[in-house]
Amino acid sequence: MKVLLCLVCSFYIIVSSITTMTTGTPSMPAINRQTLYLAAYSSKLFSWNVGCVKTRHLSQEGDWVTRSLIYVFTFDKKPWETKADAFKVKWEPYSPLLRVQASDYVKYNLRAKPEYFIRTYDDDFLLLSDVKESRSPCSLWVTLKYVERIPETINRTFYANCPDPVTVPFDERCYP
């Protein structure tokens, strides 16, 4: 009986390691080096004078990653006025929370929160929402790979989980 149990356990370990090797764990976009673009959000998060929002990796110190938040402010002006501010993010592997340290300016003007719930992610997208509610305002961030066309599975997840969804129209001026 013990031999059979050991064989079953060994088989399970081998199969699970093969599965992990072939599928792998996706990397968390918020802490890797890729640029992320705001692709969609809940209408409650809309700011009429903010657009072309993206975030780039700047550095890492310990568990905290510093990213820049780059956006166009006030579309009425020509040329557009680009703003940038740094913020820090921390994610512990497999945690459902993304911790954020932002400047007072970003907290007040762009309504950044200290924590976000990670609804889902993979190497090329990240769906965040407020922590408190089950159907709370969301933001969908994607890499350049998905800027023009968001895959159907991601889109369905976004529309199912986020109230009053709004997609950001593709504007090539935003993606140099």
Curated annotation (Swiss-Prot):
Write out the annotated subcellular location: Secreted
Signal peptide location: 1-24
Q: Does the keyword Aminoacyl-tRNA synthetase apply?
A: no
Q: Which residues are glycosylated?
A: 155
Where are the disulfide bridges?
52-174, 138-162
- Annotated InterPro entries: Calycin
A GO cellular component entry from the record? extracellular region
Print the keywords alphabetically: Disulfide bond, Glycoprotein, Secreted, Signal
Q: In which tissues is it expressed?
A: Expressed in salivary glands.
> What's the entry's take on its domains?
Each monomer contains a pocket that accomodates cholesterol. Cholesterol derivatives (such as epicholesterol, epicholestanol, epicoprostenol, or 7-dehydrocholesterol) could also fit in the pocket with minor rearrangement of the side chain. Since arthropods are unable to synthesize cholesterol de novo, it is likely that a cholesterol ligand would be bloodmeal-derived.
Family (UniProt)? Belongs to the calycin superfamily. Lipocalin family.
Question: So what does this one do?
Answer: Salivary tick protein that modulates host immune response. This protein blocks dendritic cell (DC) differentiation from monocytes. In addition, it inhibits up-regulation of costimulatory molecules and pro-inflammatory cytokines in response to stimuli and promotes up-regulation of co-inhibitory molecules and the anti-inflammatory cytokine interleukin-10. It has a pocket to accomodate cholesterol, which may have immune-modulatory roles, either directly or through interactions with the host gut microbiota.
Subunit structure, briefly? Answer: Homodimer; non-disulfide-linked. Each monomer accommodates one molecule of cholesterol in a pocket.
State what protein this is by name: Japanin-like-RS
